[in-house]
Design a protein with these regions (language model features):
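Unchanged
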Residues: 1-28, 32-86, 90-99, 103-104
Length: 104
């Protein structure tokens, strides 16, 4: 987050900076505490306005995947894997929930 920025504004900015994705920000989806590194990761639902991605210089690759094609072993962060898994489970159940998770 930057000064004078809300968490959702920060998430939208990071999404643009990292993936170059044009999104319509949705609601909070997961809050993941990572105490061993003194971090809290917030993930939001969002809708892509365009499937065109323009990743920033810190990003090696940004692509869209069908759920069955997600390269789980290649995801950089455990919090991303957990969030994607929970989202796919919620979507299959027909109800998107907010998840509060503590990683130990």
């Amino acid at each position: 987050m930057e000064l004078d920025e809300t968490t959702s504004q920060g998430a939208a900015r990071e999404t643009d900076e990292e993936a170059g994705a044009d999104i319509e920000m949705g609601r909070l989806f997961s809050v993941i505490s990572v105490p061993r590194v003194a971090q809290v990761h917030l993930f939001y639902c969002a809708r892509l306005r365009s499937e065109t991605l323009n990743p920033g210089y810190e990003t090696i690759e940004a692509r869209l995947f069908q759920p069955a094609d997600i390269p789980w072993d290649e995801l950089a962060f455990r919090t991303v894997s957990i969030t994607l898994q929970r989202y796919l489970e919620d979507r299959a159940a027909g109800s998107i929930q907010v998840h509060n998770i503590d990683l130990t």
